[in-house]
Amino acid sequence: MSWTEKYRPGSFDEVVGNQKVIAEIKEWIKAWKAGKPQKPLLLVGPPGTGKTTLAHIIGKEFSDTLELNASDRRSQDALMRSAGEASATRSLFNHDLKLIILDEVDGIHGNEDRGGVQAINRIIKESRHPMVLTANDPYSKRLQSIKPRCRVLNLRKVHTSSIAAALRRICRAEGIECPDDVLRELAKRSRGDLRSAINDLEAMAEGEERIGEELLKMGEKDATSNLFDAVRAVLKSRDVSKVREAMRVDDDPTLVLEFIAENVPREYEKPNEISRAYDMLSRADIFFGRAVRTRNYTYWRYASELMGPGVALAKDKTYRKFVRYTGSSSFRILGKTRKQRSLRDSVAAKMAGKMHISPKVAISMFPYMEILFENDEMAYDISEFLELRDEEIKLFRKRKIKAPKRKKTPRKAEIKVGPLYSQKKDKGADKSINDKATDKSAKTPIKSSKKDDRPRDESSSSSDDKKPKEKQTSLFQFS
């Protein structure tokens, strides 16, 4: 059994540090036992501050404990199956409370975690049992919707003197002789991480009855470095071993790369040094891309060598000057261009829907759209077709679009068949007139045929010649 498990505190009295937080936890437990449901506890703090240990001690105050690691069960279905039903049900005959522990709720990352945060919020809302959640990063975006539903307790790093006292008790229990200055140095190196200090002590004491300064130097290491310390070591030193030690940081390695890239021109003076440094950084970025694409994170090792020792050796000599290092400007640029990027994505989505293309292809067409929008009439037609807002139109042209004054033109169908249509119309009119005449003659009674003794002129005689010889005397009689 490791010493961290062997000497894990079993009660609140044995916990090192964060006494104010422990007092609030005791009040929370007391309220639950009095039948007053409370918000879930969200224990937030860096590694080694005792979050999981406190959760286990709280579990001893209730009848049962259900512990889940949220980063292992990331999807909504997995979380609901594991904790959803258990949190929403209570026995009809047993009123004992069950503690539900969700560890590392800020460890949900990636596309596979769809619905994970929503599931946690749903479990919190429906839970009829006390809940304790733990997280390392208080500023994680995953906690934005969870924090309002919880009682947040921030755990601070354990003080160096408290860590040294805990290490001293372990040495006495194990029968190991260790000077106080060595224990203080171990505590200092742990940077407030009690678990890390105990692990270091166990590693140094293996097979030994006494720990002296010589063992301390042999086991010397800096568990984690500050981000700016790592950047300073890379840019100020040419010592490869020193740079490698400084590169052991807890931050995202791509963030370290951005910080180094931002400060290279501030430290290096010669153009060839800057060129070599950025060549190393670009190669490191390629390996980061491969790691993400193939999910083979051993590529990070090569990226770390390139952006650490590679950049450090890119300079011909170290510069003994004061340089004020700054953070990555990419975050400031992204903040300033957030609105513009939002408009770009909105227009790309509209183009993709209307033109049946991908948003990526739509964005690649923006330069051509700027050319098309130089024509007022075309700009008006395109903006009407895509249903663009005024602020979206400004992506392609600065001045407003005026509605063009167009002449009224005949409809397309009339242009094509206009003469034919008019001819058909005239023929139809003549036909209707003839039909009316036929109907009128059909209704008029037929007079008896008698010779007319009145004189007739030439016109009448000519018209009589055209008449049939035998007159029709009945509607049903035909010649």
Curated annotation (Swiss-Prot):
Q: Which SUPFAM superfamilies match?
A: P-loop containing nucleoside triphosphate hydrolases
Q: Identify a single GO molecular function assigned to this protein.
A: DNA clamp loader activity
Keyword line = ATP-binding, DNA replication, Nucleotide-binding
| Residues annotated for ATP binding in this entry | 45-52
Organism from which the protein derives: Methanothermobacter thermautotrophicus (strain ATCC 29096 / DSM 1053 / JCM 10044 / NBRC 100330 / Delta H)
Region described as Disordered: spans on this chain? 402-479
Nucleotide-binding found in the keyword field? yes
Give the record's GO biological process terms.
Answer: DNA replication
Briefly state the protein's biological role: Part of the RFC clamp loader complex which loads the PCNA sliding clamp onto DNA. The complex possesses DNA-dependent ATPase activity which is further stimulated by PCNA. In conjunction with PCNA stimulates DNA synthesis by PolB, relieving inhibition by replication protein A (RPA).
InterPro entries attached to this UniProt entry: AAA+_ATPase, ATPase_AAA_core, P-loop_NTPase, Rep_factor-C_lsu, RFC_lid
Q: Gene3D superfamilies annotated for this entry?
A: 1.10.8.60, P-loop containing nucleotide triphosphate hydrolases
List the protein's name: Replication factor C large subunit
